[in-house]
Every structure is written in C-alpha cells, then in structure tokens.
Amino acid sequence: MQNSTLYPSVYVLGNGQLGRMLRYAGAPLDIHVQPLEFNAPVFDLPKDAIITAEIERWEKTPLTELLGHHKNFVNQNVFGLLADRFTQKSLLDELNLSTSPWCLLKDKTQWPEVFKNVGEKVVVKRRTGGYDGRGQWIITENNQCDITDDLFGEVIAEKFIPFDYEVSIIGARFKNGEKRFYPVTHNLQQNGILRYSVTDISFPQQQSQQMQAESMLGKIMDKLEYVGVMAMECFVVGDKLLINELAPRVHNSGHWTQLGCAISQFELHLRALLDLPTPSLQPIAPSVMVNLIGTEHNSQWLNTPFSQLHWYGKEV
C-alpha cells in the first residue's frame, strides 16, 4: 500500500486481528496503517509517523525497543501502567472510582488479613497477563495453598463479586480533551472468554449505566491525558458499576461497531490519534457480536442477513 499524502503513517505494535482491523479502517480515509510483527526488522521511521499498539505488553526485540520508547509513541507510558493490575487498581483507588476491594498479595502470612479485610472468597490474579480466564484462581481459607510461593508479589487478591452481569464501554479522547463514547455493551463470558456482546440502547438501566460509565472512563482518560480508544469492563451489581479491567486499545467487545455504527472503534482510534473531526457516535441498530472460538469455518454463515464475518483463524 502506498503511503498517504494526506496524513502521517500509523505504525501498530502487533500484527494480530486488531492490527489488521485498524489497517482496514484506515484505507477508506487514505490513512496508511502498518501493523508490525514484534520480530520485524528495524527500519527508518518517518519523522511525522505515529505509533500505537494493539496489545498492552510485548516481547523485547530490536524493533519493540525502538518503537516502544520512541517520542512518537502515543500513550507510551499508559501501556505499562494499565498492563499491571497492581498499578491499574491503584489508579482506580487514587481517582476514587468503584472497583472490587483488593490488595497486593506479598506472602502467605497475609491470608488472615486478606480474608478479613478483602473477603472470605477472593479471586487471585496475576499482575500481568492472565487474560481469558488464565492466571486466575478462586481462593478461600480451604484452598489457599493453591497459591504457591513463587506467585507471591506477582499477584493481587480481589474480593469475589457475585455480580448480576457484565458490561463494557468503549470511548475515545482527543488531544483537546473532547471525548466520544459508544453505548454500553452487555457481555456474556464463558470460562473467562468473551462469547457474545449485545448493544441495545432500549435496555433497562441503559441510561443510568451510560452516565456512570462515561463519567468513570472519562475521568480515567483525563487523568492519563490519554489520546485514542480505551475500553472499560465493569461488573453490574444492582444499580452500580464496578470497574473490572481497563484496556488502552481497541477491544473485542467493540467489534460490533464495524457494522452497528457509522464509525467503527478502529476508525475512531485513528481519528483520535490524527485529531480528525468526529461527530457523536450514533448506533445504527441493536447489534450482536458472536465470538466464534474452537469451531470449524462454515461458509453458510455468509447467508446470515445484515451480518459481517471476520475470520482470522485464531487458535484456542
């Protein structure tokens, strides 16, 4: 693809499905987006190039060392901050935003204090990694020995929350502080993996949840002086949202925006990075995203009306 003459090129750390979708979103606007494998060869970066990432953490290679510390890497310091659950939860506490009670688990002598102050039942999570249900343990006094000595200092303990359901919101912040938000999306997880996302602005509690979510995510993005798309996952407990996870990037719960909104989350991220004019985000219709995992490709899916198929052959 020939580089754009209208806008600076955007280089993406990571060449997975999110990087590919960013590249597709840039094409109609003549924005050259180049996803990069971590082990790709080093090259001379154009002076006006913009760097972003499709993932919070990356392996150390000559290319990631060059781009990951480059002055043109937007939100450079945010990725490491939010990739670590300890610093992420500390940020939420600093901003006085609702999240599950938690603590850093340093050694086994803490267990009595944890069960007293955090909860009788806790979820122990690795500080980094451990997504899609991996690197997480449900712990009570009866199975605390499941957390081995090598994990202490590398995990946090959160109170187990018997939530009603899960939602997420995706928003973007521009350089001047303006923000745009998609409607709150309802998510169904199975074994810690997102399987369905449903968006419908007529859902009960949608308006109150939207106000809460926009306020919380907006406060976070302002504090970080963030530019681009960020996702926030929440537990719903009664009429209250508890923040579960933040992702400083485009997010799988926002895939519905590719067909359900005039501006997808991928295009929105590029618009924010390049500081392009952007109207309010209006959904076209109620939308559903189904995450096809561990299933064979079926060409009959293409017969489904008013749908798009995105097949990227990701292994389970």
Feature roles, as predicted:
Residues 1-90, 109:
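ATP-binding N-terminal substructure of ATP-dependent carboxylate-amine bond-forming enzymes
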Residues 83-220:
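Active-site nucleotide/adenylate-binding loops and adjacent lid/helix of ATP-dependent enzymes
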Residues 6, 94, 271-316:
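Peripheral (often C-terminal) accessory segments that flank ATP-dependent C-N-forming ligase machineries
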